[in-house]
C-alpha cells in the first residue's frame, strides 16, 4: 500500500459535505481520474449485488468479481449505491491556502450545517490521529474501473440502501472525502468519439494507484511525512501529466479503479486492468449516464417499480401482479401472441413475450413513457397546492392560478418555465448547430485567465468580468423575481465561465427536459441497445462512434445540448458542458443549475435525497470562478466541502502537478437513490433505439427532479409527488386514492378525485381531512348502484367495448352505446319510445325486424315457427348484416344465458340492467294490458308473466314486442283469464259493445287487433313501427307493438301499413314525433319528455304533486283519468257518447293513441255510461279508430274534441279528480257512487288549483272575448291585455293571467253568459246532455268538479283541465257532441270556464265578470283591489297592492289552519271563501281583533252582502255543487247559476248533485274547490238557459260575498301548534277545525286542503255576509242532496 499511496494524494474517505456520508453509508463512491496519466477516466459506480459486481460481465466495465473485501465492506449487500465523480483538471497550478473564503467556491454555506473549522488535508488528520494512511487501507482493495462513454452508454442507478436516512447535516466538513488519483495510461492519441475530441496521447502510466485518505476526526492535524510523500509523488506525476488532455486506456493492461467507500475510516479499492482500449469524450455527468444507462442489477427483483402502467390503457397499478392480471384483458389475439418457445424475451412488468429484443425494448419504452407521464402529472398534482382563485395574493401572469403561498406560487411558476426553457436550452447552448459537438464550441476562457475580479455580493462568487457577474446575478439571484427570464440563463453558455455546478445544469436540463414527458433517457436507450451486456469494446472502438449516438437528437441537431445526451434522467437536473481552453487545453466540467427552479425549502433542509458535491477546477489566486448557479440548488455541505477543500489544498505543500490535479478533481457528486427497476428497465430494453427521442425536449431543473423525498423511503404517492429522483425515473401513473383508477396526468387525476369528493360532499380543498377509506365507504354506500352498473357494463371479452349492432361502432360504456343508438333511431325518424325500453334494445329490435328480407319473427320465435315457451328470451334476432355481435346485455339471449333472462322482459325481449328497470318496464306492459292496479299488486314482473302465461300474449296489443303478441293467439284468451283480484279485468276488444270491456281493453287491443292476434305480420315483427312509417289502416295493425308509453296518437300512425314499413313503433304513440298526446287535454307533444312535463302541470293543477304511478306524471295523470272514469260507472246511463261499441273501438283501437301514452280507454276508464252511449255521428268517439287519428284525451273524454271535430270535445264535460284517496272507489278518490258517473261534478275531488286545467293545443279560447289561441301562452298574453284594460296588473289566481281573468269574469259577471261563447242554450244543452244519458259523446264532460278549472275559462280544454282535477271523466254534455256549443269539441281544450260551468257559460260569466271585474268576490276583489283598492276582507286593513294583500291573506289563512289556497290558488280568494263559509269564526275573529266592536266592511260589505245573499256563500260545497250536479234538478242548478249570477263565485260549481255527493262521500274534500261540477251536468237535464242560470248561480255561490273592508286590525294569533308536520316524505296534516289528521306523501295535502275547504265553506253557512246568503247555501245543499 505504501507504494500505492505514495503516488499521490488521496482524498479523505469521509463524506464530502452531505455526500460523503451518503457515499459511505451507501457504499458508493465516485471514482476520480488520476493525475495526468489518466485524465479522461470515468469512474463508474459499482452496485454490489451480493458477491457479484454488477458491472462485471454486464456493462463490460469490470472484468471480474469484486475483491472479496468488497462484500464485507459494503454496508448492505443487497443495496447498491453508486457514486460517480468525474476527474478532470486544467494545467493550472492549484494552490490551497488555509482558510480561503468560500465565495470563490460554490457559494455560501447554510448556517444550519455543522461546519467546525476548516478542512485539513487528510494526511494531516491522519497524522494527528497517529494512524498512517497505509494502515487504514491495509485491507483495502483499490479498484479503479474506467468506463469510457459511460455517459453515452446507458444509465446507472444510484441506489441508497432502503431504510437509510441520509442526514447530510450531521456530517462535519472534516468528513469530506477526496480522492486524488494519478495514473498513467495508454499512450497514443485518444479520440473522443462521443464528442469527436482529438486528445493528445497520454504518456505512459508511471504508476497506477489510488490513495484514499479519510480524515477520522475533526481535530486539526499537522501535515506529516505522508503529505510530503504524497507531494513528491504528485511532483513525479507532474512530469508526465497532461492535464489538458483526456484519454482512455487503450490497452487491456490499463488499470481502472473502482472505489468503494466502506466506512468513514477507509475505502476499498481494487485495481483492474481495463477490458479494452476505449476512448472517451469530454466529461459528461456520469451520474446521469449511470441513471440513463442503468446498471444491470438483480435488485430489480427485490425492488420492483412502484408503479406498473398498462400500455394499453390509462391504468396503472401499484403491484406487478395486478398489472399482470389486468393485462389478461388485453391479451393479444392468438395469432399475435408468439409461441412461448419462440419468445424467450418477456416483459418483466406485463408479461408479454417477445421474440426480438428490439420489440421488447420498444415495448419497455412504452412502459417507461407511461411512467414518465404519470410522474409528471403526479408532480404537478402534488407539488402545487390547489388554485386559490383570483382572490389570492399571488396571481400567475400566464394563467389563472392564484395562491397566497409564495412557495406554491414559485412551484407553479416552474411549470411555465419548464415549458419555456427547453426550447431555449435546446437551441442556444450549442449554437453551432452542427450535429456533432465541436470542442471549440465548448471552449471557455480559463478561470486563471480572467483578469479582474468581480465578486457577487450575494454569494461571493467572483466572475471574470462584470458582464458575467451580471449574468451570474441574473441567473442565480433573480429567480424569485421573474421566472420568465430564467430561460435566458442559457442563452450564451459558451461565452461565460460556469461553476461545475453550472456545467451540471446546462446540458442535463436539455437532456432531461422531457424526462417526465414520456421520454426514454437517451443514454438509457443506448445502454439498452445491448441489454445482454454492455460491451465497451463494441460500443467504443477507437474509431467507432457509439451506436445510437448518431441517433441522439442532441448529436444530430444543434438544437439539443450535449447534456441531453448524457443526462436523460431526472438526476440530470444539471447540464454539463465541456470547455476546452485551447491555450490551456483544459476541459472544465461545468454545471449550471437550472436558474428557474430552486430547491424547495424542504429540499434544502433535507439533503438526504440528493447530495450535490461540486467538482470543478478553480484557481484561488485569481479568484476567477465560473458563475454560481442558484445557491439553493447546491446543498450547503457541497459548498462547504469546496471551501474546506480549498483551504486544505492551500495548506498542502504539493507540487504544481499535484495542485493541478487536485484543482481539477474536486468533483460534484450527485448522490441519489435510484430504483433498481430503472436499471433493470434499461438493461431489458432492446438495442434498437428510435431514430429520435422527441420527448427529451424540456428541461427539468435539478430541484424539480431531485426533490427531498427520503432516498431510502418507499416510492409511495407522496414520494412521487415530492419528486423523488427515484420516482422521477419511473413512468408512473397516478392512482386515485379512492378507487383503482390510474391517470397519466395530474389534471385527470385531480378532476377524478374531485368527482369522488363531490359525490361524498367533500370539498377538494379539504380532501386531506377525510381519509380515503371514509370516502370509499361513503361512495360504496350511496353510489353502489352506479358503480355496480359500471362494472356490469364492463365486458372483459372486448375490454369494455360495446358495439353498435347497426354500424359496429365501439363504445366503452353502455351509456355511450345508448346515446349512439338514440342517434340511429333519430335517423330512422324514431324519437319516442317507452322510457323503460332501452334505445339499444329498440334499435336491436328494429334491426332484427328489418335486417332480413323476411320480416324477422317476433322476438319469441321465428315467423311461422312454433311458439316458444313464454319465458324463453324473446330478444329480436340481430340482423344478419350486423357488423359486430352485440356486446351488451340486451343482445340475444343465447349470449348471456339465464343470468340475463333475469333482467330481460319475456314479453318484448327488452333487456334491463337491473330488475328494478325490468319491474318498471313490466308495469308499463301491465298498464297497456289494462291492469291498472299493477303497481300495487306486488311484483309487476311476476304479475305480467303470470298474466301472460294465463292469458297468453295479446296480438301486439300493448306496444309489446311481437313475442308477447304472438304468444296469445287470441286476445280473448289473454283477456279472458282472470287476472289477479286486484287487476282490472281486461275486456276483449271484441266486446266493444260492452263499454266497460272496451274501456278496459288495453289500448293496443282493438277488437280487430285482438281478433287477429298473431295473424298480422306486423305482430310478428317487432311491434314498434318507425315514427315515419305509415300506419296500417287495419285496426289490427294498430295495436301498439312497442308503444310502451301510452301516448295518444293516431292509430294509423301507430302501425306500419306493411310489415316492411316501420318495423317497430318506437314511439309510444303512433306518431312518435307528433302524436304523443295528452290524454287530458289532447295536446300533442314532440316526445314523452314534453308530455311528461305537460302532465306534471296538469297534476299540479289538480293538486297532485307526487307521481305515484311508476313515478311517471304521464302514468299518474292517466291513472287519475282512468280512475275518475271508472269511478263514475253509475253516471249517466246513456251519456251522449258514442255507442259503447264505437267508443270501445275508438278507445281500444286508439290504444296508445287514445291515451296519453297510447293508453286504451280502459286505462282511462271512461264511465261505462259514456262508453255505452252511442256516439253521435259527429262525436269524436264515434269516429272509427282507423279513420281518425288515435283518440286523444279529448276523444276519450267528452270534454276532449277529436282532432276531426272543429272544436275539441268540451273539456268542461270532463272532470278529473286527482285524489284517489278522496274518491271512494278509486285510488284518487274516484267519485262516490252517489255522484253521477258523468254528471256529478266532484268539486271536493277537484284539485284546489284552478289552473289545473289541461291546455288544449288549438281550442284555447279567451273566456272574455271568445278568441281562439294556438296555445296557452298566446291566451295568457291575451288575458294579460284584458286584465290590464281592467286595471288588473297582478295575476292573483295561481299567478296566471288566464285564471285571474276567468276568476274576475266569474266574480264580476254573475251572468257569465255574456260571453261570446256558444249561447247559453248551447251550453245548457251541453250541460243537459252531460247530465242526461243522451249527452253528446263529444260532451263527455266528466263532471269535473274542478271549479278552479272551470274558473279558468281562459285555459282551453277547460274540460280536460277539469278532468285532471277530478280526473273522473264524465261527459257533461252528452246530447250535442260537437254542436253542443262552444263546449263541444272546442270545449275539449277549454276546461269549464267557470268552475263548474261549461266554457260557454263560464265565458258568459266571464264577460259579466269583465264588466264587474273588481266586484268579483275573491278574484273580483283581487281585480278590483288591484285596480282600485287592496283591502283585507277579514280585518279591513288596506294595502298598497294585491301582492301585499295576498301576503296578508296568507297570514290569516295560516292562522286558521288553511295552508293551501284552494280558490284559484289565491290566498285572497281563499280567505274570502273561508270568510263566507265560516261566518261564526269570522265574526268571532273580527270581534276579537276589533275589541268587541262590530266588524264592518266599509266598501263592499253591502255589495258583497248582496252578492252573497244572491248566491249560497260557498254553500256550493254542498248546495251549490249539488245544484250543478243535479242534471235533472233544474232548480238547484238554477240556484247555483243564480248564485253565480249574483256575482258570487261558485266555488263548488260542479253539478249540485255531484258536488253534494262528493261532499258526502268525501268529507275531506273541499267543496268549494274550483273544480265545481260543470253546470253541464246540471244543464244536461235542462235547457241552455237553465244551464246558464245554473252556471251563474254557481258562480254566485262560488264568488265570495262582497268583501266588507274590516277596520284595520292586527293579524289574529296563529294556531297553538303547527298544522303541518313532516318526517321524510310523510306529512302529517292536522285540521284546524277538527281532530282529523291526514298522513301520507305530499299529495295528501290535497285531501287536507279539501277538508279544510269544506270547513271553510261550512263557516259561510252559519254566518254568511248577509243573511240571504245562508238560505241560498241550504238550498244549494238541498239541491246537492237531491242530485244524487
UniProtKB/Swiss-Prot annotation:
Residues 1599-1611 have a biased composition (Pro residues). Keywords: Isopeptide bond, Metal-binding, Methylation, Nucleus, Phosphoprotein, Repeat, Ubl conjugation, Zinc, Zinc-finger. It is found in: Nucleus. Residues 1-77, 854-876, 1005-1072, 1127-1208, 1320-1384, 1496-1587, 1592-1611, 1662-1684 are annotated as: Disordered. Residues 1335-1351, 1672-1684 have a biased composition (Low complexity). The modification Phosphoserine is found at residues 1029, 1039, 1045, 1050, 1058, 1112, 1139, 1155, 1160, 1167, 1179, 1184, 1296, 1342, 1347, 1550. Part of a complex containing at least CDYL, REST, WIZ, SETB1, EHMT1 and EHMT2. Interacts with EHMT1, EHMT2, CTBP1 and CTBP2. This is Protein Wiz. It comes from Mus musculus (Mouse).
Amino acid at each position: 500500500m505504501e507504494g500505492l499511496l505514495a503516488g499521490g494524494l488521496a482524498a479523505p474517505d469521509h463524506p464530502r459535505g452531505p455526500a460523503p456520508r451518503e457515499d459511505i453509508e451507501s457504499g458508493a463512491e465516485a471514482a476520480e481520474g488520476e493525475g495526468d496519466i489518466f485524465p479522461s477516466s470515468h469512474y463508474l459506480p459499482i452496485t454490489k449485488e451480493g458477491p457479484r459486481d454488477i458491472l462485471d460481465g454486464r456493462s463490460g466495465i469490470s472484468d471480474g468479481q469484486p475483491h472479496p473485501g468488497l462484500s464485507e465492506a459494503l454496508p448492505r449487500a443487497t443495496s447498491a449505491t453508486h457514486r460517480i465523480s468525474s476527474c478532470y483538471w486544467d494545467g493550472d497550478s492549484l494552490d490551497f491556502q488555509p482558510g480561503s473564503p468560500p465565495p470563490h467556491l460554490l457559494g455560501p454555506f447554510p448556517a444550519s450545517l455543522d461546519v467546525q473549522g476548516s478542512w485539513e488535508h487528510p494526511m494531516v488528520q491522519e497524522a494527528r490521529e497517529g494512524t498512517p494512511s497505509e494502515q487504514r487501507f491495509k485491507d483495502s482493495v483499490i479498484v479503479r474501473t474506467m468506463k469510457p462513454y459511460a455517459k453515452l452508454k446507458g444509465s446507472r442507478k444510484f441506489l441508497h440502501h432502503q431504510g437509510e436516512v441520509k442526514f447530510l447535516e450531521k456530517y462535519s466538513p472534516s468528513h469530506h472525502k477526496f480522492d486524488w488519483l494519478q495514473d498513467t495510461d495508454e499512450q497514443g492519441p485518444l479520440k473522443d468519439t462521443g464528442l469527436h475530441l482529438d486528445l493528445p496521447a497520454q504518456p505512459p502510466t508511471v504508476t497506477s494507484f489510488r490513495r484514499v485518505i479519510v480524515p477520522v476526526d475533526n481535530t486539526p492535524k499537522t501535515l506529516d511525512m505522508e503529505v510530503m510523500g504524497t507531494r513528491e509523488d504528485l511532483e513525479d506525476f507532474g512530469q508526465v501529466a497532461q492535464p489538458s488532455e483526456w484519454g482512455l486506456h487503450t490497452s487491456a493492461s490499463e488499470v481502472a479503479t473502482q472505489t468503494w467507500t466502506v466506512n468513514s475510516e477507509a475505502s476499498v479499492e481494487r485495481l483492474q486492468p481495463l477490458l479494452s482500449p476505449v476512448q472517451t469524450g469530454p466529461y459528461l455527468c456520469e451520474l446521469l449516464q449511470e441513471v440513463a444507462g442503468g446498471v444491470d442489477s438483480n435488485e430489480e427483483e427485490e425492488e420492483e417499480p412502484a408503479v406498473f402502467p398498462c400500455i394499453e390503457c390509462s391504468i396503472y397499478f401499484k403491484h406487478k401482479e395486478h398489472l399482470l392480471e389486468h393485462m389478461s384483458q388485453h391479451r393479444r389475439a392468438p395469432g399475435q401472441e408468439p409461441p412461448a418457445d419462440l419468445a424467450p424475451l418477456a416483459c418483466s412488468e406485463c408479461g408479454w413475450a417477445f421474440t426480438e429484443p428490439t420489440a421488447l425494448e420498444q415495448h419497455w419504452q412504452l412502459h417507461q413513457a407511461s411512467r414518465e407521464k404519470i410522474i409528471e402529472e403526479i408532480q404537478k398534482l402534488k407539488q402545487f397546492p390547489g388554485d386559490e382563485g383570483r382572490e389570492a395574493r399571488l396571481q400567475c401572469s400566464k394563467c389563472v392560478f392564484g395562491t397566497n403561498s409564495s412557495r406554491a406560487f414559485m412551484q407553479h411558476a416552474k411549470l411555465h418555465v419548464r415549458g419555456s426553457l427547453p426550447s431555449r436550452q435546446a437551441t442556444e447552448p450549442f449554437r453551432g448547430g452542427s450535429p456533432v459537438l465541436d470542442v471549440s464550441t465548448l471552449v471557455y476562457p480559463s478561470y486563471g485567465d480572467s483578469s479582474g475580479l468581480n465578486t457577487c455580493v450575494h454569494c461571493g462568487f467572483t466572475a471574470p468580468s462584470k458582464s458575467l457577474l451580471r449574468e451570474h446575478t441574473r441567473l442565480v439571484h433573480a429567480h424569485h423575481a421573474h421566472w420568465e427570464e430564467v430561460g435566458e440563463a442559457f442563452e450564451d453558455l459558451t461565452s461565460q465561465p460556469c461553476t461545475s455546478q453550472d456545467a451540471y445544469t446546462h446540458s442535463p436540463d436539455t437532456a432531461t427536459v422531457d424526462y417526465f414527458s414520456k421520454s426514454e433517457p437517451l443514454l438509457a436507450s443506448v445502454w439498452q441497445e445491448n441489454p445482454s451486456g454492455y460491451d465497451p469494446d463494441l460500443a467504443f472502438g477507437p474509431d467507432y462512434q457509439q451506436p445510437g449516438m448518431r441517433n441522439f437528437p442532441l448529436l444530430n441537431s444543434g438544437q439539443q445540448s450535449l447534456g441531453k445526451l448524457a443526462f436523460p434522467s431526472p438526476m440530470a437536473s444539471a447540464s454539463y458542458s465541456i470547455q476546452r481552453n485551447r491555450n490551456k487545453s483544459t476541459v472544465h466540467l461545468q454545471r449550471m443549475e437550472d436558474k428557474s427552479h430552486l430547491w424547495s425549502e424542504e429540499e434544502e433542509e433535507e439533503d438526504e435525497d440528493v447530495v450535490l458535491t461540486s467538482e470543478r477546477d478553480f484557481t484561488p489566486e485569481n479568484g476567477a470562478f465560473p458563475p454560481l448557479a442558484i445557491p439553493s440548488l447546491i446543498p450547503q455541505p457541497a459548498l462547504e466541502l469546496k471551501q474546506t477543500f480549498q483551504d486544505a489544498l492551500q495548506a498542502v505543500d504539493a507540487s504544481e502537478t499535484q495542485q493541478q490535479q487536485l484543482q481539477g478533481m474536486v468533483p460534484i457528486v450527485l448522490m441519489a437513490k435510484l430504483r433498481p427497476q430503472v436499471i433493470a428497465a434499461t438493461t431489458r430494453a432492446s438495442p434498437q433505439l428510435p431514430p429520435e427521442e422527441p420527448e427529451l425536449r424540456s428541461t427539468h431543473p435539478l430541484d424539480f427532479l431531485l426533490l427531498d423525498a427520503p432516498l431510502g423511503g418507499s416510492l409511495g404517492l407522496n414520494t412521487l409527488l415530492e419528486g423523488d429522483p427515484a420516482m422521477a425515473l419511473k413512468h408512473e401513473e397516478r392512482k386515485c386514492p379512492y378507487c383503482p383508477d390510474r391517470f397519466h396526468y395530474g389534471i385527470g387525476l385531480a378532476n377524478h378525485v374531485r368527482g369522488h369528493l363531490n359525490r361524498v360532499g367533500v370539498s377538494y380543498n379539504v380532501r386531506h381531512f377525510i381519509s380515503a377509506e371514509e370516502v370509499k365507504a361513503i361512495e360504496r354506500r350511496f353510489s353502489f348502484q352506479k358503480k355496480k352498473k359500471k362494472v356490469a357494463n364492463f365486458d372483459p371479452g372486448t375490454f369494455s367495448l360495446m358495439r353498435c349492432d347497426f354500424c359496429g361502432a365501439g363504445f366503452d360504456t353502455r351509456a355511450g352505446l345508448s346515446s349512439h343508438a338514440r342517434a340511429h333511431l333519430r335517423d330512422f325518424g324514431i324519437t319516442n319510445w317507452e322510457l323503460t325500453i332501452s334505445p339499444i334494445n329498440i334499435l336491436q329490435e328494429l334491426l332484427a325486424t328489418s335486417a332480413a328480407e323476411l320480416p324477422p319473427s317476433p322476438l319469441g320465435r321465428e315467423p311461422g315457427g312454433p311458439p316458444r315457451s313464454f319465458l324463453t328470451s324473446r330478444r329480436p334476432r340481430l340482423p344478419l348484416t350486423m357488423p359486430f355481435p352485440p356486446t351488451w346485455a340486451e343482445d340475444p339471449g343465447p349470449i348471456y344465458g339465464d343470468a340475463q333472462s333475469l333482467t330481460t322482459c319475456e314479453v318484448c325481449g327488452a333487456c334491463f340492467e337491473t330488475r328494478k328497470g325490468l319491474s318498471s318496464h313490466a308495469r308499463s306492459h301491465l298498464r297497456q294490458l289494462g291492469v291498472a292496479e299493477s303497481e300495487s299488486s306486488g311484483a309487476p314482473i311476476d304479475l305480467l308473466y303470470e298474466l301472460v302465461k294465463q292469458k297468453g300474449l295479446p296480438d301486439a296489443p300493448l306496444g309489446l314486442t311481437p313475442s308477447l303478441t304472438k304468444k296469445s293467439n287470441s286476445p280473448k284468451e289473454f283477456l279472458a283469464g282472470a287476472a289477479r283480484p286486484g287487476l282490472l279485468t281486461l275486456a276483449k276488444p271484441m266486446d266493444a259493445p260492452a263499454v266497460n270491456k272496451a274501456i278496459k281493453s288495453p289500448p293496443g287491443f282493438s277488437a280487430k287487433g285482438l281478433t287477429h292476434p298473431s295473424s298480422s305480420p306486423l305482430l310478428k315483427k317487432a311491434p314498434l313501427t318507425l315514427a315515419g312509417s305509415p300506419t296500417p289502416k287495419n285496426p289490427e295493425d294498430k295495436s301498439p307493438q312497442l308503444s310502451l308509453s301510452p301516448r295518444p296518437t293516431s292509430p294509423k300512425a301507430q302501425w306500419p301499413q306493411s310489415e316492411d314499413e316501420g318495423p317497430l313503433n318506437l314511439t309510444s304513440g303512433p306518431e312518435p314525433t307528433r302524436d304523443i298526446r295528452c290524454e287530458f287535454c289532447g295536446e300533442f307533444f314532440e316526445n314523452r319528455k314534453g308530455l311528461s312535463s305537460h302532465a306534471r302541470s296538469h297534476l299540479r293543477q289538480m293538486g297532485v304533486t307526487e307521481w305515484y304511478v311508476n313515478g311517471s306524471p304521464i302514468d299518474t295523470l292517466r291513472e287519475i283519468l282512468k280512475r275518475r272514469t271508472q269511478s263514475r260507472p253509475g253516471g249517466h246511463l246513456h251519456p251522449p257518447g258514442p255507442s259503447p261499441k264505437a267508443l270501445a273501438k275508438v278507445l281500444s283501437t286508439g290504444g296508445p293513441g287514445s291515451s296519453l301514452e297510447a293508453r286504451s280507454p280502459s286505462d282511462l276508464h271512461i264511465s261505462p255510461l259514456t262508453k255505452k252511449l252511442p256516439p253521435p255521428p259527429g262525436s269524436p268517439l264515434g269516429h272509427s279508430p282507423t279513420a281518425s287519428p288515435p283518440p286523444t284525451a279529448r276523444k276519450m273524454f267528452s270534454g276532449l274534441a277529436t282532432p276531426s271535430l272543429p272544436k275539441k270535445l268540451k273539456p268542461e264535460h270532463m272532470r278529473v279528480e286527482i285524489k284517489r284517496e278522496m274518491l271512494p272507489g278509486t285510488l284518487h278518490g274516484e267519485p262516490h257512487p252517489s255522484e253521477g258517473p258523468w254528471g256529478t261534478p266532484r268539486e271536493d275531488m277537484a284539485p284546489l288549483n284552478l289552473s289545473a286545467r289541461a291546455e288544449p293545443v288549438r281550442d284555447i279560447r279567451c273566456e272574455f272575448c271568445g278568441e281562439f289561441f294556438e296555445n296557452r301562452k298566446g291566451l295568457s298574453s291575451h288575458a294579460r291585455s284584458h286584465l290590464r284594460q281592467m286595471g288588473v296588473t297582478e295575476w292573483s289566481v295561481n299567478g296566471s293571467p288566464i285564471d285571474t281573468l276567468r276568476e274576475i269574469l266569474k266574480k264580476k259577471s254573475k251572468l257569465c253568459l255574456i260571453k261570446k261563447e256558444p249561447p247559453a242554450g248551447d251550453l245548457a244543452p251541453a250541460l243537459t246532455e252531460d247530465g242526461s244519458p243522451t249527452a253528446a259523446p263529444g260532451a263527455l264532460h266528466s263532471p269535473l268538479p274542478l271549479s278552479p278549472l272551470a274558473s279558468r275559462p281562459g285555459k282551453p280544454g277547460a274540460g280536460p283541465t277539469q278532468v285532471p282535477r277530478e280526473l273522473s271523466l264524465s261527459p257533461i254534455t252528452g246530447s250535442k257532441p260537437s254542436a253542443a256549443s262552444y263546449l263541444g269539441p272546442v270545449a275539449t281544450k277549454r276546461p269549464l270556464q267557470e268552475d263548474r260551468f261549461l266554457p260557454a257559460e263560464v265565458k258568459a260569466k266571464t264577460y259579466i265578470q269583465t264588466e264587474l271585474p273588481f266586484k268579483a268576490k275573491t278574484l273580483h276583489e283581487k281585480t278590483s283591489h288591484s285596480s282600485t283598492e287592496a283591502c283585507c276582507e277579514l280585518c279591513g286593513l288596506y294595502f298598497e297592492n294585491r301582492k301585499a294583500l295576498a301576503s296578508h291573506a296568507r297570514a290569516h289563512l295560516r292562522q286558521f289552519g288553511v295552508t293551501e289556497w284552494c280558490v284559484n290558488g289565491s290566498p285572497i280568494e281563499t280567505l274570502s271563501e273561508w270568510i263566507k263559509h265560516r261566518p261564526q269564526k269570522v265574526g268571532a275573529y273580527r270581534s276579537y281583533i276589533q275589541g268587541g266592536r262590530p266588524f264592518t266592511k266599509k266598501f263592499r260589505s253591502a255589495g258583497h252582502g248582496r252578492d252573497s245573499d244572491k248566491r249560497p256563500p260557498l254553500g256550493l260545497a254542498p248546495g251549490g255543487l249539488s245544484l250543478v250536479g243535479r242534471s235533472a234538478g233544474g232548480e238547484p242548478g238554477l240556484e247555483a247559476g243564480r248564485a253565480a249570477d249574483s256575482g258570487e263565485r261558485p266555488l263548488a260549481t260542479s253539478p249540485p248533485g255531484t258536488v253534494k255527493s262528493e261532499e258526502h262521500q268525501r268529507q275531506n274534500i273541499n267543496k268549494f274547490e274550483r273544480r265545481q261540477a260543470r253546470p253541464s251536468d246540471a244543464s244536461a237535464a235542462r235547457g241552455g238557459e237553465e244551464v246558464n242560470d245554473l252556471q251563474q248561480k254557481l258562480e254566485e255561490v262560488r264568488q265570495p260575498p262582497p268583501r266588507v273592508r274590516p277596520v284595520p286590525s292586527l293579524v289574529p294569533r296563529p294556531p297553538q301548534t303547527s298544522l303541518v308536520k313532516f318526517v321524510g316524505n310523510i306529512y302529517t296534516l292536522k285540521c284546524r277545525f277538527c281532530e282529523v289528521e291526514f298522513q301520507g306523501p305530499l299529495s295528501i295535502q290535497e285531501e287536507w286542503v279539501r277538508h279544510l275547504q269544506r270547513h271553510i265553506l261550512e263557516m259561510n253557512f252559519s254566518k254568511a255576509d248577509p243573511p240571504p246568503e245562508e238560505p241560498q247555501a241550504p238550498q244549494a245543499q238541498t239541491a246537492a242532496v237531491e242530485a244524487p
